[in-house]
């Protein structure tokens, strides 16, 4: 399962967030409330990775685990989390969500600009800050041409983003396994894009899993280029599953490196739980938060 498979359900209004009785039982087994965290890392979780829970149940779960943010929600989902006092740490637009059709192709600019011009004021009005975007796949477009296309299109929405205090964040994906042909698949490419756009309201969503797969050198990359990174995602390598000792990344050291940069934004868990038992899936999120709470 990956995020692309969840996009269609989001557009249909379900977001894939249905709750089975077994999931409910597992959810109710968690008795801890307001687990004290150290406060050096602001934690979040990507909604699509816990899609066996209803969104309001996921809100209650994250509060029981001691944090108060959820990633990757569209405007129609915000009222649900607002009722629970939960923050949307990374927003979608209300329109078409495509990881493969993005800013690197001028033929997409008209609908993208329309969607983002509508979404930016909504994000600001809701009290949120981050709005995700995607480069799109190459589809034969040269990387340099694609970058210039991104610059041309994104600059048309930057004044509005700056006016509203919204940060547009392009996600870095690996093209080796999960997102073949995706253009923004190297941190160097994304960093150069940030430099060309030249606004504090455009940054990169540095996905630790994706960049470990595509290029490695995670801690050094963060230390050297943290000013271009506005958000972080986690998952284990290989497999995109739990971030425990079954995979190769040592997340406590990565989190310490992030905290040492002075970063005050969110780190969102985006691993796909490998266990089929819902109680174990919830336990995995609890464990991941503890691992990252340095």
Language-model segments: which ranges?
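Catalytic domains of carbohydrate-active enzymes, especially glycoside hydrolases
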Residues: 58-77
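Short acidic, glycine/proline-enriched helix-loop-strand junctions
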Residues: 78-92, 150, 166
